[in-house]
Amino acid sequence: PLEAARYIDEFHSPDIGWHFDVGNVLAFGWPEQWIHILGKRIQKLHIKEYSRKKAAKTGPGSGFDVEFLEGDNDWPAVLKAIDDIGYSGWGIAEQPGADSPAGLKNLSDRMDRIFAS
């Protein structure tokens, strides 16, 4: 995350920031740490789940094949970090399952549970 922050800072432009993806970072690190370090550089936020256990068992790409709350994100810590940096932008769901009314409801219900945590 330190290198990512420096990379953005090297542009010396308020128009350049980070499109932060919680699930992608969890595959290799701790999203809450990245959020604190990137801080105000975060301009957009992808809300995505990831399972390290599944990735270790069946390959890295399979870690993304889990529903919200079935992976390894520490959602209370992630939400606290987001709050700590004063982020007030959009949170974009980047999860499969919104291809039917029932799937969309499931996705929405799970996101509600995340944001209530």
At which residue positions do the language-model features occur?
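Histidine-acidic metal/acid-base catalytic patches
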Residues: 1-16, 23-117
